[in-house]
Amino acid sequence: KIIDNRIIKTKHNPSVFPKVKRLGKNFYQYPYWNGDTFYSNGTPILFKKLLNWLENNVWIKYKIPNSRMKELCETFYHTKTNSRISLFLSDNPDYIFPKFINGKITPSLEKLFQQIPWKELFCGIPSFIHGDLQFQNILYNKKSKKFLLVDWRQDFAGSTKFGDLYYDLAKLYGGILMNYDHVIKDNFQYQHTGNKVIVSFKKWKNASEYKKILDDYINKNNFDKYKV
């Protein structure tokens, strides 16, 4: 079903995804596209162009009842997260949760979950989204000056047509604060001793500029930065 929904999703907005040429039960195939990830060739100027491209080509707004959007967001954010926590606890019964991270007191997992402003998160913005808008999933061809999105999420709580725009914005924000390309290349350090954890990672070049650009975009469009 994941593969099927991914293909269905591309048909809702084919210009931003590669065209799937071959489909199997557990795989799909599309032609090689000559481009590099945004992590590899991004610049602050290009990031502004990316946001403009996303706004005009990807984030197509949908009009649906508020109750329907609330239902989808609750399923995607709350129900799915709670399910993943339960699965983790079941698979790791002896795991010691840290009480200190980088020297700061950290509430228990249960308290953190309770502190999340769920009601605010359930008020999403219905829009077509990528669903996993990490910078390594954004390709750019310098010669043609075109963007292409890969490795898209198949659906948002079952919906292939739309999801919550805030989710894409949050993915971008997270990718600025922590460069996932560095994580993949093991450019980070993690030490877990007893109930204490120390984490350090390499910052992305121009991260502060990217953050300001995204902050300005969020404010300009009257989005809720707290929710992002």
Predicted features and spans:
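Conserved short submotifs of the Hanks-type protein kinase catalytic core
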Residues: 27-36
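Conserved NTP-binding catalytic cores of kinases and kinase-like/nucleotidyltransferase enzymes
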Residues: 1-26
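Amphipathic alpha-helical segments that form well-ordered structural scaffolds
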Residues: 5, 9, 53, 209-217
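Active-site activation/catalytic loop segments of kinase-like enzymes and analogous catalytic loops
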Residues: 155-218
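All-alpha amphipathic helical-bundle segments outside canonical DNA-binding/catalytic cores
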Residues: 222-228
